[in-house]
Amino acid sequence: MRRSDGHEETSEFLPMTHSRSVSAASQTSTDSSLSTESLFPREQKPFPNAMGGMALADDDKYRDLEDGEAEQSEPFLSSSKKAATGGGRARRIFWILVLLCLGGWLLAFVLFLTGGRANYQTASDALQAHGADSALGSTSTSSGKPVTLHQVLGGQWNPRYHAIGWVAGPNNEDGLLVEKGGDEKQGYLRVDDIRSRKGNNTGRESRVLMRKPIVHVDGQAIVPSNVWPSPDLKKVLLISEQQKNWRHSFTGKYWVLDVDSQTAQPLDPSAPDGRVQLALWSPASDAVVFVRDNNLYLRRLSSDSVVAITKDGGENLFYGVPDWVYEEEVISGNSVTWWSNDAKYIAFFRTNETSVPEFPVQYYISRPSGKKPLPGLENYPDVREIKYPKPGAPNPVVDLQFYDVEKNEVFSVQVADDFADDDRIIIEVLWASEGKILVRSTNRESDILKVYLIDTQSRTGKLVRSEDVAGLDGGWVEPSQSTRFVPADPNNGRPHDGYIDTVPYNGYDHLAYFSPLDNPNALMLTSGEWEVVDAPAAVDLQRGLVYFVGTKEAPTQRHVYRVQLDGSNLNPLTDTSKPGYYDVSFSHGTGYALLTYKGPSIPWQAIINTHGDEITYEDRIEDNAQLTKMVEAYALPTEVYQNVTVDGYTLQVVERRPPHFNPAKKYPVLFYLYGGPGSQTVDRKFTVDFQSYVASSLGYIVVTVDGRGTGFIGRKARCIVRGNLGFYEAHDQIATAKMWAAKSYVDETRMAIWGWSFGGFMTLKTLEQDAGRTFQYGMAVAPVTDWRFYDSIYTERYMHTPQHNPNGYDNSTITDMAALSESVRFLVMHGASDDNVHLQNTLVLIDKLDLSNVENYDVQFYPDSDHSIYFHNAHMMVYHRLSDWLVNAFNGEWHLIAKPVPDESMWERMKRSLRLLSP
């Protein structure tokens, strides 16, 4: 529950999320198609920054150091006879000194074991911090084994989730889904009625789409990695030999399977080996539009030939697929091609990158370009020249074009009041009815939104809505593709077409209904001091209901709600009487949904029926029984949720306490953060991650605070960071850390902070602003160190252009090396082939450190690794290094090496002592 009094709120074993920018898992399906990953039960991939195996940090390292100390005494022992020649008095003095040395060494050793290492051993008393809804099902975490890093990195603590590929039947039937698995009789790929899963006689019989998981074409075995059934369910589009490009994009060989005959043919029979970047079914199921070599093609199934829609695509000109920066920062997908609902038109982007500067990314071991070097050139790195616009540099020029399928004609529509070519970012395209299409665009700095309505039949367009968001609250427009078209239905009280969009309203993001399409004035569907999330989720056109996920109960929670299209009768579908974090996926007609409970207790999934006033549960499809067993067997950290107030802003905090937490002890504290604009790291999902390992196995407290700039705490707190990234965010981390340093159970001399990507930037910015007064240590992975080095679309959204805001860029850059030198020590790690946050960031930082004679840092590079740092076991090594480095920090090892001096041998010290004692 949301608390405003600042009191602690105990909870179940609640998780923390991982921001996309840390290292988002790649999607492999298009936004408008279905794939095997999105259709079928699957094991959720381990969270992006903790995959792979990894050895635990153990005590061997510290025993080795002790052994080294013993070795240093060997010269003294081997030289003892020489000392004995000085007579009996000298011998007595000698043995007294020996005993004193040995006694001192033993005392230091005992103190080291009982004191120095107590920080990661558990105490005897357990904090009773779990209620009836606990993931453990008990009120104690005192029993069980510690969480291991190997388990976390191997994904053993990840909940198992299923995704349902809802499809509309050929006659618009609701409740149909695509499933895979089973023998040849059942069919490998089939369409089932959700009502048939429980033996309901009203359900339709299954329809087999693919009998076997492998199909043969001219004797060649095709093993598809993704599938896309046609809307009429008579064909299936297959992809094989799929290869990843960037985060969302990929290429592969495409095939069309006929359901009746179970035979397949290449998508383009004239080029069966051609690698295709994108393929999309026509809503009429009679054609496929696809992209190859950055050109757009149409394959009508009635013919074996294809029609070239565009012909001049190439290295600098893209049709139908996004370039790197649009894929990463605007669309978050691999498709910028959209069929009209009546299949008469195709809208697509034309992206011109000619003026965009290139950035070279080098690969020293692998050759992602696929090019075989010429003889004698094998020892040179493979170089990918990426068109990467940095702040202030030319952006790609993106235009929206249209293809008339019947006339085989490409055209564009000029609209008055459009942004100039170098000042336009198209963030969403949405088809309406009768050839009309809505286009949402922003200016380059993403603080002015314009919505255009284009009529492709008359080839005219007009501006229908404009919002100056910067003038409203100093904020920005976040790209999204969640706007929903609502068709006219006079019988149901909708005389005109309309659409539902998310807009700023009284300081929070809420749902607004615009009807007719050219009406700039909205009917607000939601309001209040909370926000909707990626809304709406679905619209029930028959009953006039809008479904959405929101934070009405608390910023850290997600519940499912519905509201009438007139804004009345807003009610929750999920149980809001206790903390919860839900997600939902609706069937085509919204009569059914897959409800996913993600925490705080053990996650589960169920099919629900939404036809009545209250939901009914049709089928429980996942309860994560294996997680229940693991929770019972392992000692998970206690998570305490609370609010803190900094400069009048209420911020969400979660504190992970080690099992057997003893308030009489003094614990080291690790702060973990991401902190990017609009992000959220403190939430109520069940997660056992690297932070859980640190608390459970190492015995440290881990604190996360979502400071100003993060999401779901209101636009005032979010927008204040614009133009000066890092200042308020770091201030909030430091202010919260000072609160923790004052707690009786915290060792204020052992406090660290770490993060990845934006979190890496925030780690360095916090150390810079703090100058060693609160945090002694920091660990930054793949950090931005100067926002002039990051991509233009993301950076200018929050910082304006460098020409517009030079002082802001200067302030946000990591520049104060003297302040960094005040920390005890910090660690920086980076993938050498990072195409997202370029290695340039860390190299320039190192140069600044060198020029300032700063030496209190460690640095590690990982060859051929991108932003997620996976290449050749690198991900395992990253977390191994983080864990070991942190243990060394909190054990005081970095103090010992801070100012190294030659160590005089013990024998020389003894001789000097003897001379002083001699008469």
UniProtKB/Swiss-Prot annotation:
Name the UniProt record assigns to this protein: Probable dipeptidyl-aminopeptidase B
Vacuolar side: 114-919
MF-aspect GO terms: aminopeptidase activity; dipeptidyl-peptidase activity; serine-type peptidase activity
Keywords: Aminopeptidase, Glycoprotein, Hydrolase, Membrane, Protease, Serine protease, Signal-anchor, Transmembrane, Transmembrane helix, Vacuole
Top-level taxonomy: Eukaryota, Fungi, Dikarya, Ascomycota, Pezizomycotina
Cross-referenced PANTHER family: DIPEPTIDYL PEPTIDASE 10, ISOFORM B (PTHR11731:SF200), PROTEASE FAMILY S9B,C DIPEPTIDYL-PEPTIDASE IV-RELATED (PTHR11731)
Membrane topology: Single-pass type II membrane protein
Highest rank taxon of the organism: Eukaryota
Residue ranges with Basic and acidic residues bias: 1-10
Region annotation (Disordered) ranges: 1-53
Documented EC number(s): 3.4.14.5
